[in-house]
A protein has these predicted regions:
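Conserved pre-motif I regulatory segment
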Residues: 2-5, 21, 30-71
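SF2 helicase motor core recognition
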Residues: 79, 143-149, 225, 319-324, ...
Length: 345
């Protein structure tokens, strides 16, 4: 696939890649018309939060470069980096900007965090509500509501969980819009790989946001003490000797995972063991469907559940009760728990 037109036009985020290619073939005296002025960034503090060194460096580079796909691992504080960038751009100014999300839950969580950071004139737009503001947090599904106020006016475009925006007509159209956004920043823990067989996802993101900037790896942050070192235990579950040939994958999953008493009892025993060893333990269990939630809830004491039918406020109310429970507790959720949800415990 070609990423430039017959007359040489290309997405501006690909400029650094194209310049590099030109240099590799010996091109010299490359001229760059209308090159943006380089301004030394000022980074103000936000709320009561203190930046780690790599977070402050990431904010500096985002502001200096104006475009970046920020590659930062889960737990590294991407949302604080986002808030720091916006706070810096609001210093002595009142810019218009949009932060796009795919998930309402992450939007709500980010909105509350940005308020704690002191982000000014903050707005909110999703299927569950609308609050006007110059810095508008919006789901891509509800973007039509802010077209008139933010499409041409926005000087800032940010995208959270950016790997979710490199496929699909609606999401790609969204990140390729906002023509006057001179600051274009995308944040993800899993950017599409450079050497992937399907390079299109990477090129779509780079075209809209520029090259990848890596903060620190998860391994680095574990060594620094910023992230806890995970302990992974693989629990043996003796496989069945044979499976009927006429069963579909879903039939097999229901029979040998969701409704398997031996397997579910083993999960119950593990939870009970943790409860006995730590009277304040907090356990998270992720499953794929509602029936599995019910099967485990019947077995596990002091158990909270989150399902897709729960609205955003209900989900956070349940999480808050779970975190503040003064006894050992378990929370079981489906895929609504699997992206970007922050649980302090």
């Amino acid at each position: 696939k070609r990423y430039f037109t017959a007359n040489g036009k290309f997405r501006t985020g690909l400029l650094s890649r194209i310049v590099k290619d030109l240099e590799e073939i010996g091109a010299k005296d490359i001229e760059w018309e209308n090159k943006p002025e380089q301004i030394e960034p000022f980074i103000p503090s936000v709320g009561n939060f203190k930046y780690r060194e790599y977070q402050e460096r990431a904010i500096y580079n985002c502001l200096k470069r104006k475009r970046a796909i920020v590659d930062s691992p889960t737990g590294s504080g991407k949302t604080l980096i986002m808030a720091g960038c916006i706070a810096a751009l609001q210093w002595g100014d009142n810019p218009t900007g949009v932060v796009l999300f795919r998930e309402k839950g992450i939007l709500k969580q980010t909105y509350e965090f940005f308020k704690k950071c002191g982000i000014k004139d903050l707005g909110y737009n999703s299927g569950e509500g609308y609050v006007p503001g110059k810095i508008m947090l919006s789901t891509v599904q509800s973007i039509e509501r802010i077209i008139d106020t933010h499409l041409k006016e926005s000087e800032i475009l940010m995208v959270d969980e950016a790997h979710q925006f490199c496929k699909g007509d609606t999401t790609i159209a969204a990140i390729e819009s906002f023509p006057n956004a001179s600051y274009r920043l995308a944040f993800t823990a899993t950017p599409p790989r450079e050497g992937a067989k399907d390079i299109n996802a990477r090129m779509v993101l780079e075209g809209a946001f520029g090259s990848v900037y890596t903060t620190r790896t998860a391994e680095d942050l574990i060594k620094d003490g910023a992230l806890a070192k995970p302990i992974i235990q693989v629990v043996d579950n003796t496989p069945v000797s044979s499976v009927a040939s006429d069963l579909t994958y879903l039939d097999i999953y229901d029979q040998y995972v969701v409704n398997c008493d031996v397997r579910n009892d083993k999960i119950k025993d593990i939870v009970s063991k943790v409860y006995r060893s730590n009277p304040n333990a907090k356990i998270l269990i992720l499953v794929k469907n509602l029936q599995h939630i019910e099967n485990l809830q019947e077995r596990i004491s002091n158990c909270y559940t989150i399902e897709g039918k729960d609205d955003i406020d209900s989900r956070y109310d349940i999480i808050n009760k779970f975190v503040k429970d003064n006894k050992a507790a378990t929370i079981i959720g489906t895929n609504v728990m699997q992206t970007g949800i922050s649980i302090d415990e």
